[in-house]
């Protein structure tokens, strides 16, 4: 809705829609608050069956576009690299690596360079504009998946800076990664804390939960299996079933 950038108070476009669909409860809540209309939740369809699962290695993975804080929807890669560096310096993470994957537009190259400088001297691998086969290989072989979108942001002032849903989280779970994600926005609707992953509110919690997983193969394996099962709730089949329910309730064909 680019016209909302010109005049956020002009909601006349809503008169041209019979129904509004939201991609999460988080989005629905803000549609209600900002637009004053009710929406139906329809989670995006994800091809979970296509995500490969291979022998897991001591890898932590984070995936998202490189966007500097204050510019847009930042995935907070810099903060995650710094947190991982802190974990490495404290010890007890022998053999573990962090892989940072994401697209990078020319305007964001200074931010990418900042992330790369923070990674120097650490077992951190930065993959800018990685091809899809490499991304899938990292999904398949990584053990833990990190998300920090929204860290340090104010939801009341800028709700768009948070994950409205979290497609890459579901993809990682389908590939058998244990998600350790920020306890904000759409991530809350995907990851059930202590059941199929963990949610955190501070970087100290992120480090503690990740360290617990890194040191406990049995726990990591159990949560990984639960994560794969949970990802099925967001499959294409689940999407079709949910859409049919919505269509029937609304009298649509």
Language-model segments: residues:
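Membrane-proximal helix-turn-helix segments that form the acceptor-binding/catalytic region
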Residues: 1-20, 27-29
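Conserved catalytic-core segment of nucleotide-activated headgroup transferases in glycan assembly
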Residues: 33-37, 46-50, 55-118
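Short hydrophobic beta-strand element within catalytic cores of glycosyltransferases
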Residues: 169-174, 178-181
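Conserved acidic donor-binding segment of nucleotide-sugar-dependent glycosyltransferases
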Residues: 193-204, 212-217
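A charged, aromatic-enriched C-terminal amphipathic alpha-helix characteristic of glycosyltransferases
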Residues: 201-205, 218-250
């Amino acid at each position: 809705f680019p016209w909302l950038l010109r005049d956020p108070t002009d909601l006349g476009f809503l008169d041209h829609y019979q129904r509004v669909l939201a991609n999460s409860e988080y989005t629905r809540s803000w549609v209600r608050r900002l637009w004053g209309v009710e929406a139906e939740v329809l989670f995006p369809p994800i091809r979970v069956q296509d995500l490969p699962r291979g022998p897991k290695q001591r890898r932590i993975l984070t995936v998202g576009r490189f966007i500097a804080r204050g510019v847009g929807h930042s995935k907070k890669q810099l903060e995650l690299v710094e947190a991982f560096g802190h974990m490495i310096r404290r010890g007890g993470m022998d053999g573990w690596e962090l892989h940072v994957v994401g697209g990078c537009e020319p305007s964001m190259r200074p931010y990418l360079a900042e992330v790369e400088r923070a990674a120097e001297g650490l077992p951190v691998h930065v993959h800018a504009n990685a091809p899809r086969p490499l991304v899938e290989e990292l999904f398949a072989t990584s053990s833990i998946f990190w998300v920090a979108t929204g860290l340090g942001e104010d939801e009341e002032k800028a709700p768009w800076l948070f994950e409205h849903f979290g497609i890459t989280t579901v993809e990682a779970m389908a590939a058998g990664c244990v998600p350790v994600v920020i306890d904000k926005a759409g991530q809350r609707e995907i990851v059930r804390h202590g059941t199929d992953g963990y949610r955190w509110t501070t970087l100290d919690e992120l480090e503690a939960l990740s360290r617990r997983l890194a040191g406990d193969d049995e726990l990591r394996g159990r949560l990984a299996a639960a994560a794969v099962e949970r990802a099925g709730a967001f499959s294409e089949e689940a999407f079709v079933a949910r859409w049919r329910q919505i269509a029937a309730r609304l009298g649509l064909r």
